[in-house]
């Protein structure tokens, strides 16, 4: 399992600038633009409901704008698809100007794709003499089709290893814990970069007036701050501030986990902040981050790549709580307690799209992560008498999948309908 865990971490913990759904749209649009001949006259974008939900209202770094149109237009303008999830980093003023001109021309059409896939992006570009099409499915960089003028340039479903994806469900918490505890430090120290990268964004979020300023207001000095200046509030503030900045379009890279920057924030910053407060070594932090990330990836596999439930608030925060428990000296039993406590607490947190209020959910999840770690380290756990929690932590995690598949079938449709109706009424 050692090689599988390392391969998984290197595949699922990767940098991105901006929210991953609009970036994936920009990536697809960039590839399509690179193959089109002539001046673009029409842009047709077909998206799964989950992608629309997560791209509709989120800030696009460096643009001052939000949403799908500007992301797609930037991809067309930039045409640097080799950058993948960092395609929106360091674009020029001329590229931004061209993108805004494309948006202003009103040639971008966005439609919902009738598909069972949670993550589906299709971008079709038309000129007077040419047509190109690109499809991304399942994960944010998995290009399955490139077509230009009815010629198939690439038709490939092999980039995503379905075997590896399915293996995530086989990751047992006991095995993850043992790997985190026993792995050679030289093999896992690369994971420290996730904390360093994400804490830089947190620092920016605490300094600037980003989004709802959830993080900065927790630690502000003044007569009207009800939060005390204690360790837990500093951890919550640091975590929320990174999301404040990211969701408001801060042009800094974030290390994602399982396809999401907010999941990366949620499972790394609380762990790094706790390690610093406890004066832990880099090796101890790396082991806690490995545990946190792998638990996040395992839970997220049961939730789905995109989900009606909040991946950062549930999977990411549960990973963080496990990492915190580990840093506090917790053993496997304490880790199991921690997971049962977290899922008992946060399993109903919905995902109503990527937007500035994600920082509120990060704050809520981080608070729960600290609270549940504290209970777990004291030998206190939710039991099989409590709701969807099972005696076996593996069954508790699997119950999330059952909840989504059987209980939340229509939730995404309902959420998206509310969002689109609101957008229509606000025009």
Swiss-Prot record:
Single GO molecular function: L-cysteine desulfhydrase activity
Q: Pfam families, alphabetically?
A: SDH_alpha
Q: List the disulfide bonds.
A: none
Q: Which GO biological process categories is it annotated with? A: L-cysteine catabolic process to pyruvate
Q: Which superkingdom, per the lineage?
A: Bacteria
The UniProt entry, under PANTHER family, shows: UPF0597 PROTEIN YHAM
- Family (UniProt): Belongs to the UPF0597 family.
**Record-given protein name:** UPF0597 protein CPE0806
> Organism, per UniProt?
Clostridium perfringens (strain 13 / Type A)
């Amino acid at each position: 399992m050692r090689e599988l865990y390392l391969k998984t971490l290197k595949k699922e913990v990767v940098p991105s600038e901006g929210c991953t759904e609009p970036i994936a749209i920009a990536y697809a649009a960039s590839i399509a633009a690179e193959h089109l001949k002539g001046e673009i006259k029409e842009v047709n974008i077909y998206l799964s409901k989950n992608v629309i939900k997560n791209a509709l209202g989120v800030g696009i770094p460096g643009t001052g704008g939000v949403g799908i149109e500007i992301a797609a237009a930037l991809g067309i303008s930039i045409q640097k698809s080799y950058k993948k999830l960092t395609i929106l980093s360091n674009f020029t003023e001329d590229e931004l100007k061209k993108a805004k001109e494309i948006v202003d021309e009103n040639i971008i059409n966005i439609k919902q794709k009738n598909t069972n896939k949670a993550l589906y992006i299709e971008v079709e570009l038309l000129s007077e003499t040419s047509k190109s099409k690109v499809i991304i499915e399942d994960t944010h960089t998995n290009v399955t089709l490139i077509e230009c003028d009815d010629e198939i340039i690439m038709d490939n479903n092999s980039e995503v290893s379905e075997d590896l994806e399915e293996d995530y469900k086989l990751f047992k918490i006991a095995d993850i814990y043992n790997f985190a505890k026993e792995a050679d430090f030289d093999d896992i120290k690369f994971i420290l970069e996730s904390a360093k990268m994400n804490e830089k964004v947190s620092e920016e979020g605490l300094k600037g007036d980003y989004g709802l300023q959830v993080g900065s207001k927790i630690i502000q000095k003044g007569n009207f701050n009800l939060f005390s200046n204690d360790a837990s509030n500093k951890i919550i503030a640091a975590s929320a501030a990174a999301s404040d900045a990211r969701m408001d379009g801060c042009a800094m890279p974030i290390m994602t986990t399982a396809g999401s920057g907010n999941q990366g924030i949620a499972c790394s910053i609380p762990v790094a902040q706790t390690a610093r407060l406890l004066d832990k070594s880099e090796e101890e932090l790396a082991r806690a981050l490995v545990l946190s990330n792998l638990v996040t990836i395992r839970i997220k596999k049961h939730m789905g790549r995109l989900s009606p439930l909040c991946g950062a608030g549930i999977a990411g925060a549960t990973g963080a709580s496990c990492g915190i428990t580990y840093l506090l000296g917790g053993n496997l039993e304490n880790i199991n307690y921690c997971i049962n406590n977290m899922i008992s607490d946060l399993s109903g947190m919905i995902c109503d799209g990527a937007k500035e209020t994600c920082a509120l959910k990060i704050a809520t999840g981080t608070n729960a992560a600290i609270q549940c770690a504290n209970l777990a380290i004291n030998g206190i756990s939710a039991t099989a008498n409590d709701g969807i929690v099972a005696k076996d932590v593996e069954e508790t995690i699997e119950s999330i999948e059952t909840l989504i598949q059987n209980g939340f079938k229509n939730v995404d449709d309902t959420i998206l309908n509310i969002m689109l109706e609101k957008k229509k009424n606000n025009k």
